[in-house]
Amino acid sequence: MRPIVRGNWPTNTAGENIVFTEYQQARGELIKRMGELCSFCEMHLDTSLAVEHVQPKQPIGATAIIAARLLDWHNFLLACTNCNSTKSNKDVILDDYLWPDRDNTYHSFAYSEGGIVNA
C-alpha cells in the first residue's frame, strides 16, 4: 500500500481554509493530492472514487451525525466502492491499524505470488 500525503487543509486564493459545506466537495482537492487511486487497494478509478471518512460521520449507536467528523479535512481519504463499504460505520482506534496517510505503509506489507498479504 502506497503512503499518502493528504497535506494541510486546502486554502483559497486569499490563503484561508476552504470551507466545505458537504464532504463530497473535498473530492477534487483530495484527487489533486492523492491521485485517482483508492487509498486502500490502490485501484485506479477516475469517476467512482468516494470521499471516505476515517472516523465514521455517524458511528454505530450514535443518534446523530458528529459534525466535527463530517467536514474535517483530516478525516478524509479516497476510497473505491468496495473499500468504502467494507469499513462500515464502526469507530476506529487509529493506533490499531496501519493508515496510508499516517504510516509508511509502503514497507508494511509483503505480497506473495499467490495473493497472500502479510503485515
Language model features with spans:
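Short, charged surface segments at domain edges that flank catalytic/cofactor-binding sites
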Residues: M1-L37, I60-L71
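Hydrophobic, aromatic-enriched interface-forming segments
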Residues: G114-A119
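Histidine-centered nuclease catalytic patch
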Residues: F40-L78, K87-T105, F109
